[in-house]
Amino acid sequence: MIAQSTPTHTNPMPDGTLIDFGTAAWHADGTEFQTSGIRNPADGDVCQGVWQQVDDATFVLNHYALAWTNGTYTGPANIRARVTVDSTGNHYSGVFATVVYLATPVAGHEFDQNTVLASITGTFKATRVTMQ
């Protein structure tokens, strides 16, 4: 995932900044699971989402991650993506928009999305892992 800033971003990252890399599994039941290669496992490197097919080769993803910094929960991050699979079915690419929220200190409200810490948009690409 590579950042691509716009004037409306909150705390934008410079264009071309590597946001994340890792592995993802999209399941037939419409769920998705990702392991981040850029985040320290101690700070939370696993997240999940749901996807929906919108045409023959296009899918949308609604993905949630829990953001941690040095062992402290900082809040939820919502990643929305639009994915296009190539004709071989072995590669995909797309665009994403991520909003990272500040966690509220009130117990039971850890997923509140009231205070935006950062908003990031960008592009990504992936290659299917096979047994060959």
Indicate where each model-derived feature is located.
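Alpha-helical assembly-interface signal, strongest on the long, hydrophobic N-terminal helix that forms
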Residues: 12-21, 27
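Well-ordered beta-strand positions in beta-sheet-rich domains
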Residues: 21-23, 48-50, 78-82, 119-125
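Structural signal for glycine-centered tight turns and loop->strand junctions in beta-sheet-rich domains
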Residues: 24, 28-32, 57, 89
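Tryptophan-anchored aromatic micro-motifs
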Residues: 1-14, 49
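A short gly/proline-enriched turn/hairpin at secondary-structure junctions
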Residues: 8-14, 34-41
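Contiguous, well-ordered beta-strand patches that form the walls/edges
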Residues: 37-98
